[in-house]
Amino acid sequence: MNSKKYALVTGASSGIGLMYARELASRGYDLVIVSNQENEIKQTAENIEKDFSVKAHPIFMDLTDDMAAEKLLQYCKDNNIEIEVLINNAGVFFFNPIIKTAKKRVDVMLDLHVKTVAHMCQVFGADMAERGHGYILNMSSMSAWMTMPGINVYNSTKSFILNFSRSLWYELKPLGVTVTAICPGAVDTGLYGLSDY
């Protein structure tokens, strides 16, 4: 068993995910940080290791891959890493009427915000439950509570994350694992510029 505390953060190369990673590092956590921006995630790992004297494992990965969660867990097992904190932060955003939006953009959002979040919670939640402790934080949004034209796919997926997390809390709490959903308002993170898949 590895005695070090490890946290896994998705979408950690910029924005809120980067801030989560740096905050966790400041609290002494070693990190597994994941992004689909290869150069940025490597630089993030270097900066975090230099600034906080912790270990940061950068992983370049497309999280919409059906086996992404399993691949990440296998990486952790291969490197004797037990994830104590999981932050499902990776996301995309676009503002466009659904009838004028390319199918691929819709699919990426559905995959990343629904399937990936569910699979990550399923795979790492089971691993945490087996050990009897762990914490999962899922990034929802204030838009989960409202209907807005132009972001109907986005707010629907964030509603899924919110309700999924609420239900998961009841399933995992007796097993020693806590689940939280965060619903922030608009944050200027550059996400608009990253959403053009």
Placement of each model-derived feature along the sequence:
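Active-site helix of classical SDR
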Residues: C121, T157
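Conserved glycine-rich Rossmann-like NAD(P)H-binding loop of the short-chain dehydrogenase/reductase
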Residues: R27-Q43
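Substrate-binding pocket helix/loop in short-chain dehydrogenase/reductase
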Residues: P97-I98, R105-L110
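Residue(s) in the substrate-gating loop at a strand-loop-helix junction
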Residues: S141
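SDR active-site lid
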Residues: N163, W169-Y197
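Conserved glycine-rich cofactor-binding loop
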Residues: Y6, S13-G15
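Conserved NAD(P)H cofactor-binding loop of Rossmann-fold oxidoreductase domains
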Residues: N89-F94
